[in-house]
Amino acid sequence: MGLTPMMRQYLEVKESCKDCILFFRLGDFYEMFFEDAKVASKELELVLTGRDCGLEERAPMCGIPYHAANTYIGRLVSAGYKIAICEQLEDPSASKGIVKRGIIKIITPGTYTDSSFLEENKNNYIMSFYLDDNMCAMSFADISTGEFNSTHSNFKEAVVLDEISKFAPREIVLEENIKESFIHTIKERFPNISISKIKEENFDYNIDNNLKEQFNNFNENEYETIVKKSANGLLYYIFHTQKNILSNINKIDYYSIVDYLTIDVNSRRNLEITENLREKTKKGSLLWVLDKTNTAMGGRQLRRWIEQPLINKNPIENRLNAVEELLNNISLQEDLKEDLKSIYDIERIVGKVASKSVNAKELISLKCSIGKVPYIKKYLSGFKSDLFLNMEQCIDTLEDIHKLLDKALLDNPSLSVKEGNIIKEGFNEEVDSLREAKSNGKKWIASLEQKEKEETGIKSLKVSYNKVFGYFIEITKANLNLVPEGRYIRKQTLSNAERYITPELKEMEEKILGAEEKLIDIEYKLFTEIRDFIEENIDRMQKTARIISDIDCLCSLATVALENNYIKPNINAKDEILIEEGRHPVVEKVIPKGEFISNDSLIDTKENQLILITGPNMAGKSTYMRQVALITIMAQIGSFVPAKKANISICDKIFTRIGASDDLAAGKSTFMVEMWEVSNILKNATSKSLVLLDEVGRGTSTYDGLSIAWSVIEYICNNKNLRCKTLFATHYHELTKLEDNIEGVKNYSVSVSELENEIVFLRKIIRGGADQSYGIEVAKLAGLPSPVINRAKEILQHIEGDKEENSLNIAPSKEYKSKDYIEVSKDTLNTKNNLGSEIKHDTLSETNTATIIEDESTKEHLSSNRKQINCRINDEKSIKKEVAVDSFQINFEYIKRDKIIEEIKNIDILNMTPMEGFNKLYDIINKTKDID
């Protein structure tokens, strides 16, 4: 039994899009079969049915109405799937055999343009990556807006990950033979990105001609070959999915990575630049604070400004001067903002023009938007700063386009461009004539209805229309006896009425419907001509849209500065960051107004190169460090900053090692990740960089951690090629001694007030190191039970009293009772031969107990050493006894060795991954380092 012709056709089409869900058009439905149907039915909550396909088993099938497809497509694309749209390419009624079908478009996460599923203030980027030896190139495009950016650099995974983090593409196009390990790295870090592969030849084919045809500004001699390959590969993929050349992608913008402030992946996350750490949403981020834009275009542009702060003084100061001028001209600023509120998303409307998917209502939105441009140009002429003057000279008012749209299109046209009711009266004579004929015909219909009512005496008689029968006379059954015999021709019988026609009615119907059909065709033709004219002028509209988005960004920064009492920073060349009464821009917005404690900062590359900050957890060290970084970023964006005064030197890179970055799911321990991040910073930071390091060394033993932190400080301060501006927060109070030994180290701490055994964090950074960590007080604030807090204080007193010795002398808690106890001297336990393996020590528990395993030899030995070991045992029959320690002095080297041996014995090597095994070995090696 063979496949049916339709199913053979389906499988042939499916062969060309194996990685897609195929929407196969059958009549008024898109049908999915086999595995596609199973996936779609699950994701879209559709009923899974079956269809005879010529095989023994029915083909799994589900379907959706074609007119509702966009909603379902959006859900699938949002879930990361690719959709191939297979349409009927001929009229089924005119086809003698099976209807010809073909794929007209492939919709992927990176090429989706439906505005209802795109974030209006965020680009939907697709990226291509090309690797050649030790060089790599990357291109980023947003086909909904027409942006196309390319760059290249020496290949480092960190560089690529940084750019991915910056642009946040939904999809990455790679050469099909690229190493799977690299793909794994990308997916591990960015699990929501879709990966697509194309052949090597698609990056190379007809490269210069393709780029010249696509980009108006392309000069083959200006670009490295690897950049051209990356761009060509991305253009191929866009054409392959969209099935046509998109005219809104008409300019390639090359950028150098070193032209912008580098903020690596971890720092973007830790500083919460565009999204918060917990929910991964905009609220609580720097973008959330700064975004007061009034247009979608401005929102996207501001995000780009924040993702790519500047490193050249002139453009930074141009933005700052423009913001300052807006603040000095509140009236003009308000006029600008009011007109910006009326501007729609010109970039994405123009993108729909390029893809031939724009409708008349969207062109009316375009008309309204560009109608505001002459007013904006007039407002710009009232400013004097260089940036605004340049904008005023460059902005195109697009008056010819506005005039055409205003003259041609109805103010409230049909949503569909193939239903008529688009063209305004007076624009085209033929349209006016057909509309009159259509109108006259309908007037004739109305007069016919009135005449028939009068002549028959049937007041309920009506002349109606539907698409199946056309025009007809309808009379209810209650009035059929009033119908004159032979007056009408019966057309249709209903349960409660009869429908009739007359020759005159059918004749007029042909005239009316003929006029309507012709009118729809002519209106559509005129609409496409208008659309084509706009497409020819896309470049002009895009330039104007970019200027509008820049104006919107500047107005947003001015609004935020005014609302939050920001000041204009001074951009200096002294390699110095000097901030007076600085505030964290986000934290001050989420706590009650006026409660944020401001702090001063002075960091340079000489006497104040490394600011060593000590103090308890929860006191505000991390907030303070992030505050300095965010103020620096804001200044380099061109924003005013939250401070009383700010002198900011331009940084080339910002690095952070703040907070837990555990990546246990990827087989990486806390300490391993921490050391990798520190290593990355030390290798890539320069003397122009700003580095934030928080609790370096915390993930390992105390002495290992202290040693590493100490060494890192020395390396940063003593390496002449580094000496970067650094904020270093630590719990290791021993490091405060480095101020006297290393040039550039300065001690600071968070001020704490002690009142009647209570502490108050004053959140103020003061000169000098902290003398204690207040860990127990923090635990108390966190809500630990009082018995635990009180016992911790007792233990701390003993530890601090014995800290100069290699022993602990800790009295038992009075809350725990036992009849049995043992006194063990330090010297006895140091003599391994005295006790051998007869005494086994459990890990010290919360009850401070030890365990003794007794046998006859042990008793005899203990008896002979009564001067060394005084032991009172109440129940000699007991083999295992719990004893409370009255005065317990114990050699920790012995316990550690015993614990490590036990830990090694318990390792289940057969059920470990290689990475888990490596981490366990690394952990054990660290533990043995503490044993002499």
UniProtKB/Swiss-Prot annotation:
What span is annotated as the signal peptide, if there is one?
none
Query: Matching SMART domains, A to Z?
Result: MUTSac, MUTSd
Highest taxon listed in the record's lineage: Bacteria
Q: Which organism is it from?
A: Clostridium botulinum (strain Kyoto / Type A2)
Q: What is the protein's known function? A: This protein is involved in the repair of mismatches in DNA. It is possible that it carries out the mismatch recognition step. This protein has a weak ATPase activity.
Name the Pfam families on file: MutS_I, MutS_II, MutS_III, MutS_IV, MutS_V
Q: What CDD domains does the record tag this protein with? A: ABC_MutS1 (cd03284)
Q: Which Gene3D superfamilies match?
A: 1.10.1420.10, DNA repair protein MutS, domain I (3.40.1170.10), MutS, connector domain (3.30.420.110), P-loop containing nucleotide triphosphate hydrolases (3.40.50.300)
InterPro entries, per database record: DNA_mismatch_repair_MutS, DNA_mismatch_repair_MutS-lik_N, DNA_mismatch_repair_MutS/MSH, DNA_mismatch_repair_MutS_C, DNA_mismatch_repair_MutS_clamp, DNA_mismatch_repair_MutS_core, DNA_mismatch_repair_MutS_N, DNA_mismatch_repair_MutS_sf
Listed A to Z, the keywords are:
ATP-binding, DNA damage, DNA repair, DNA-binding, Nucleotide-binding
GO molecular-function term, one example from the UniProt record: mismatched DNA binding
| GO annotation (BP), single | mismatch repair
The record's family statement is:
Belongs to the DNA mismatch repair MutS family.
Q: Where does ATP bind?
A: G615, P616, N617, M618, A619, G620, K621, S622
The answer to whether UniProt assigns keyword Nucleotide-binding to this entry is yes
**Official protein name in the record:** DNA mismatch repair protein MutS
Gene Ontology cellular-component terms listed: cytosol
> HAMAP family recorded for this chain?
MutS
